[in-house]
Amino acid sequence: MMPEATRSAAGGRPYWNGTAVRSRLFDALSLLLPAGEAFLIETLQAWRAQASTPHDDALHDEIDRFIREEGAHQRAHARYNAALIAGLPGAEAVARRAERVAAGLADLGLPMQVALAAAFEQLTALVSREIVEHDTLLVDDGSQPSRLWRWHAREELDHCDVALAVAARGAPSRWLRRLALVLATGYLASDLVRYTWALCRCDIAAGASRRALLADGIRVMVGSLPALARMARGWLGFAVSPQGRPHGQA
C-alpha cells in the first residue's frame, strides 16, 4: 500500500514530487513565480529605458533574451498554477497574496528594484543548480511538473548573469546589493514556508492526515540538509562578491 504522505487527499493520487511536502513546496514556489517574473521583466525594462550609461548592444540583446525567457516561464507557471488551483481551490488565495506582495515592490526606488531583481535571480539560480545537478529537492521521473522545473532551471542558469550585469550598472553599491540579498532571502524563505503550509492545510481540509504531513515535513527537512548546505555556500559567495557566480558556473 502506498504510504499516506505520498498520496494526495484528492482521490488518492500520488503527489508528483514523491511526497506531500516536497510537492507542495514546489507548488508554493510556482504560485510565487508569475508575479515575481513580472517584477523582473518590468525592472529590467525600466532600467534600460532610464539608463544613462553608454548604449551596450550586447547587453541590450541579452536583456531582450532575458525578457523572452522570463515571459515564457511566467506563462508556463501560470498554466501550471491554473491547473493546481482547479484541483485545490484554496491555492488561489496564495497566488493573490503573492501578487500583492510583488506589486508593493514597485514603490521602491529603481536602484533597490534592480538590486532585488539580481538577488532574486541569484537565489533562483542556487535552487536551479540543485535541480539540475542533484535529486534531493526534485524527483527526476519524467512527469510534466518535473520537466517544467528542469527546463526552467536550465534557462535560469543560462541567463542569470543578465540581471547581475544590470545590477552592476544600475545598483553599483555592493552594500545595497548585499542588503537586497538579505531582504530577498527573508522574503522568499518566509513566503515559501507560509505558502507551503497553506497548501498543506488545503490538503488537510480535503482529508489528508495532519500527523502524516508533519512527519513528512520533518523527513523532508532532514533529507534536504545537504542541499541547504550547498545553497548556503553559494549564498555566502554572493554576499562576499555580489557580482560573482556562487552557484557554481564558470
Model region roles, listed by residue range:
Residues 1-250:
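Non-heme di-metal
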